[in-house]
């Protein structure tokens, strides 16, 4: 059975845009660079040719990965999400029980995660600790610097 990859609509659109860019813009540019480098003669010591071939390999690998991800995508409609329990797509406001620092995170798919933008992967330790919890609950997360405790202040959808 094919394993579905949960993601938001925004994350799915970004993957589609990257796939289109790599297939329709990057691929032709690299093919042109290979042809140009090939025209310079001896391929054994042609750094431009080898760099272009390496770029082609990287680009084609990413295209294959993106095609697989978009085919297996399970787009979750956040506008239809509700409830008090935390699950995929929830935006959660937490307070660090040690420093009283407030943090807000949205739980998203692995491909969409960007901690600096407040989006954490559903498979991250903090998201796994949050799933199924509600406002007022406390969680403990084993972080690289030791265990950290958080209290859940709010859960929002959409």
From Swiss-Prot:
InterPro entries, per database record: GreA/GreB_C_sf (IPR036953), TF_GreA/GreB_CS (IPR018151), Tscrpt_elong_fac_GreA (IPR006359), Tscrpt_elong_fac_GreA/B (IPR028624), Tscrpt_elong_fac_GreA/B_C (IPR001437), Tscrpt_elong_fac_GreA/B_fam (IPR023459), Tscrpt_elong_fac_GreA/B_N (IPR022691), Tscrpt_elong_fac_GreA/B_N_sf (IPR036805)
Domain of life: Bacteria
Keywords: DNA-binding, Transcription, Transcription regulation
Function of the molecule: Necessary for efficient RNA polymerase transcription elongation past template-encoded arresting sites. The arresting sites in DNA have the property of trapping a certain fraction of elongating RNA polymerases that pass through, resulting in locked ternary complexes. Cleavage of the nascent transcript by cleavage factors such as GreA or GreB allows the resumption of elongation from the new 3'terminus. GreA releases sequences of 2 to 3 nucleotides.
Family annotation (Gene3D superfamilies): Transcription elongation factor, GreA/GreB, C-terminal domain (3.10.50.30), Transcription elongation factor, GreA/GreB, N-terminal domain (1.10.287.180)
GO MF annotation, one: RNA polymerase binding
PROSITE patterns named among the record's database cross-references: GREAB_1 (PS00829), GREAB_2 (PS00830)
Cross-referenced PANTHER family: TRANSCRIPTION ELONGATION FACTOR GREA
Name of the protein this chain belongs to: Transcription elongation factor GreA
